[in-house]
Amino acid sequence: MRWPRGAICVLAAALAARAAGADLGQLQQLVQDCTACGLCQGRRHAVFGMGAQPARWMVVGEAPGEQEDRQGLPFVGRSGKLLDAMLQSVGMSRERDVFIANVIKCRPPGNRNPKPEEIAACSPYLRRQIALLNPERILVLGRFAAQTLLNTEATIGNLRGRVHSLQTDEGRSIPVVVSYHPAYLLRSPAEKARAWQDLLLAARG
């Protein structure tokens, strides 16, 4: 079933109101209990995120995969190991410096792209995470995550290589750098050199 645009806007507004006054612990509970879209029906775990609090960097991926859904943690398995190595190459670690989250908190079936109503259900949680963590900068990994966070349809090739700005609900401007998702880099290792350039840009930013 395709949701009407008006219904999606109402859903997003209602969830944003619920998330607005929550601290991180309360927000995590809201995510774990969320039944706002159909993704809740097939999940093992809602993946809230993990890492440093407060965080110098926030890393935002797309959605949990099979391993993340099973363990309830973001970026595990081969993609997680590559992400950790990427962060360590610029002196960062997920335990000390970085909080890692996804745009979508529950795994879409077959790792398909999320539907508009699923994005509407999860976006208020991510925006509240950003507000509470107040990172110095955000590293966004993957086309879908970048397009969602920056509200654009531009390709990742057009988005990477420069610093963007995210305006928070509190009026702050946070630098955003876009790069490739680690899963893509595992399939296309020739792009790792460009991902390294993106990391250096984020570290300078």
Predicted regions and their residues:
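A polyanion-binding, active-site-adjacent surface
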Residues: 1-205
